[in-house]
C-alpha cells in the first residue's frame, strides 16, 4: 500500500461521524435505487404475465392482414399442422387455437312467454379448445361461477343444447346465471344462419371490464361447426418459457410460417397501446430513479466539500512539503471510492432483505389499480442483476465524480494561506 493509499485509509477513520454520514447517504441512495428497480421490474413483469396469461398469449399467429382488419374469412387453414411447426421451435411452452366471431345473445326472464326475449346483447364469441387453452393460459382460474367448458357430443349436434361461458358483466346485462338458457344468433362463413340454444355453464372474470362486458366463450369444435369453419381458426396464441424469449420466439415462428401466408406478432405489437403506456410509466420511474441518485450525489458532494474545508491546513502542509496536486486529488477521490465501496456492500445486504420481503409478500393495492383495462390487486418485486449493478455503478461513478470538485479545490490550495488557517 502506497503512502497516498495509507493517508486516504487513515483519513476515513479520523472523522468517524463524517464518514458514517457519507456512507449512510450513499447507502440510502443505493437501497432506494435497488428497491425502485426491483419494484419496477417485478410490477411490469407481473402486469405482462397477467395480461398475456389471462387473455392474449405472448405471441400470436394470424392470417396476413387479420390483425389490422379482422374478418371471419381470414383463417389459418389446417391449424394443427401449423401448431406442430410452432411446437418444434425452441422456448415454446404451449399453444392454443382460437376463433373470433360476432353474435347476438338473447335471454328471457322467468315467466316470459316462449319466443319473446326480454334481454339481448351483442357479443364477441371466442371459440377455444378447453384442454389446450387451459394448458396455455390457465383459463379455468378466471371462472368465478360454474365450470369449465368440456368437449361433448353436443358440439357435433346443432339440435342439442350447447354450453357457453359468459363474461361477468355480460351475464348481468342478459340477467343470466349458471344453468340458464339463452339463444345465439349470427351468420356463418358460408352465409347460412348460425343460430343455437345454449346453457350457461359458467361466468368468467378476466380482470378486464371491457372484455367481461362483451365476450362469451364456446368450445372450438362447436364454433367451427356452427360458423362453418371446419379445421380453421383465426388465431394461434403461443406461450413461451420466459418473457425474455418472446421476441426471439416470434422471429423464429415468423420464419417458419411466413411461406404459408401467416404473420406473427409478439404482445408488444398486437397490444401496442398497453406496451406504449407501460413504457411511458417506465420512463417516469427512470426519471424518479435519476432524481434519487442526484439527491444522494448532492449529499456526498456537500459532505466531501465540508471535509476539504476542514482540512485546508492539512492540505497546505502537504503542498508545503512538496506533495504534487495530482496526489492530493488521488487521495481524496480514493477516500470517496472506499466509502462508496463500503456503501455498495452494505446497500447490497439491506437491498436483498427488502427485495426478498417485497418479492415474497408484495403489496396489496387498496383500492385495486386499473391499468390498461385490467384490475391489479397486488404488486410484487423481482430480484434481478439490475437491482445491484445499476445502483453499484451509480454509487461508484457518483462518488468519483462528485469528489473531483473538492479534490481539485484542495489540490490548488495556496500553501501559505492555508498554513495561516487556524
What positions do the PLM features span?
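Hydrophobic alpha-helical transmembrane segments of multi-pass inner-membrane transport and secretion
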Residues: 16-43, 279-314, 337-349, 397-401
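C-terminal membrane-exit region of the final transmembrane helix in multipass inner-membrane proteins
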Residues: 383-422
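Alpha-helical transmembrane segments
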Residues: 31-59, 355-361
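Short, membrane-interfacial amphipathic segments enriched in basic
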Residues: 1-6, 264
Amino acid at each position: 500500500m502506497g503512502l497516498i493509499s495509507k493517508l486516504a485509509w487513515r483519513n476515513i477513520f479520523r472523522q468517524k461521524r463524517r464518514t458514517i454520514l457519507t456512507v449512510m447517504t450513499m447507502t440510502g441512495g443505493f437501497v432506494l435505487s435497488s428497491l425502485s428497480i426491483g419494484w419496477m421490474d417485478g410490477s411490469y413483469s407481473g402486469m405482462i404475465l397477467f395480461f398475456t396469461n389471462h387473455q392474449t398469449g405472448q405471441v400470436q399467429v394470424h392470417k396476413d392482414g387479420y390483425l389490422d382488419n379482422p374478418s371471419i374469412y381470414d383463417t389459418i387453414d389446417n391449424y394443427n399442422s401449423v401448431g406442430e411447426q410452432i411446437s418444434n421451435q425452441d422456448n415454446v411452452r404451449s399453444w392454443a387455437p382460437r376463433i373470433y366471431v360476432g353474435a347476438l345473445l338473447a335471454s328471457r326472464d322467468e315467466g316470459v312467454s316462449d319466443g319473446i326475449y326480454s334481454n339481448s346483447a351483442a357479443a364477441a364469441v371466442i371459440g377455444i379448445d378447453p384442454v389446450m387453452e387451459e394448458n396455455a393460459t390457465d383459463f379455468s382460474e378466471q371462472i368465478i361461477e360454474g365450470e369449465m367448458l368440456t368437449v361433448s357430443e353436443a358440439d357435433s349436434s346443432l339440435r342439442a343444447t350447447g354450453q357457453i361461458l359468459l363474461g361477468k358483466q355480460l351475464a348481468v346485462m342478459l340477467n343470466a346465471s349458471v344453468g340458464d338458457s339463452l339463444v345465439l344468433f349470427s351468420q356463418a362463413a358460408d352465409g347460412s344462419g348460425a343460430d343455437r340454444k345454449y346453457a350457461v355453464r359458467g361466468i368468467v372474470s378476466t380482470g378486464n371490464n371491457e372484455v367481461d362486458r362483451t365476450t362469451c366463450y364456446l368450445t372450438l369444435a362447436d364454433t367451427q361447426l356452427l360458423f362453418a369453419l371446419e379445421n380453421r381458426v383465426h388465431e394461434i396464441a403461443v406461450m413461451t418459457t420466459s418473457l425474455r424469449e418472446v421476441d426471439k420466439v416470434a422471429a423464429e415462428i415468423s420464419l417458419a410460417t411466413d411461406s404459408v401466408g401467416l404473420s406473427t406478432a409478439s404482445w408488444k405489437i398486437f397490444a401496442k397501446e398497453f406496451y406504449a403506456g407501460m413504457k411511458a410509466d417506465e420512463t417516469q420511474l427512470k426519471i424518479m430513479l435519476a432524481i434519487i441518485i442526484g439527491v444522494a450525489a448532492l449529499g456526498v458532494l456537500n459532505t466531501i466539500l465540508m471535509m476539504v474545508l476542514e482540512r485546508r491546513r492539512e492540505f497546505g502542509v502537504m503542498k508545503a512539503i512538496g506533495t504534487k496536486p495530482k496526489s492530493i486529488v488521488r487521495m481524496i477521490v480514493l477516500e470517496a471510492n472506499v466509502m462508496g465501496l463500503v456503501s455498495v456492500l452494505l446497500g447490497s445486504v439491506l437491498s436483498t432483505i427488502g427485495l426478498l420481503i417485497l418479492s415474497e409478500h408484495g403489496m396489496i393495492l387498496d383500492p385495486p389499480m386499473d391499468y390498461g383495462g385490467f384490475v391489479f390487486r397486488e404488486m410484487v418485486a423481482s430480484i434481478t442483476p439490475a437491482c445491484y449493478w445499476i445502483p453499484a455503478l451509480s454509487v461508484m461513478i457518483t462518488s468519483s465524480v462528485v469528489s473531483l470538485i473538492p479534490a481539485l479545490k484542495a489540490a490548488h490550495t495556496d500553501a501559505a494561506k492555508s498554513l495561516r488557517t487556524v
